[in-house]
């Protein structure tokens, strides 16, 4: 089964380019959003495996969205997706904020690929982060998604 993702970015051209790239690589883009309110609605409705969140969402912050998604998942169990922060800026510009965020990791937009997303999620799994469980094959499995692996088949 393909990894399902939600893309969150305030740049329509990037959203379309990312959708084409990720779908060509076997990932299923379940939806897109351009702001926090839209992202929360889409995340609850679509229940994606991973949410790619641009750090700069116009007047809003991707860090704030990551915190809201983490709180929503813990409280209401409505959103159980990993967040990967993305940006055109270098990771070093946000090192402390990324470390303090509940996101699974950071990915520069220039390195966006299904393989890199899987690497981030698998690295989190190997680190023993909560919310994940090991399946018999040793591949990462998402709770509530039987038979789903982070690795592309």
Language model features with spans:
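Short amphipathic alpha-helix used as the core "switch/output" element in two-component signaling
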Residues: 63-78
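Two-component/phosphorelay signaling modules centered on CheY-like receiver
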Residues: 12-31
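Active-site residues of response regulator receiver
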Residues: 9, 54, 87
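Acidic, metal-coordinating helix/loop segments flanking the phosphotransfer/catalytic sites
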Residues: 32-50
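As written
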Residues: 62, 98-105
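The feature encodes the CheY-like receiver
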Residues: 58, 91
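Acidic catalytic/metal-coordinating carboxylates
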Residues: 35, 61-64
